[in-house]
Structures are given as structure tokens and as C-alpha cells.
């Protein structure tokens, strides 16, 4: 991952969590 925003994953629900690469759905936070 480049550390930026990644496209939503199938396991990630909009407004709930954000898919960060293959890490799965993670909280909507700016983690770098």
C-alpha cells in the first residue's frame, strides 16, 4: 500500500469501515 486511500473492499461497508489493502475492514481513520 502507498499509505493513501484504497478502494472499498467487499468486506468493507461504506460509512462503517474502510478497506486497507488486504488488512480487511479497518476503522475510518487516517492511519499512515
UniProtKB/Swiss-Prot annotation:
Disordered: annotated segments: 1-32
GO MF annotations, alphabetized: IgE binding; IgG binding
Domain of life: Eukaryota
Keywords: Allergen, IgE-binding protein, IgG-binding protein
Name this polypeptide is given: Allergen Asp fl 3
Organism (species): Aspergillus flavus
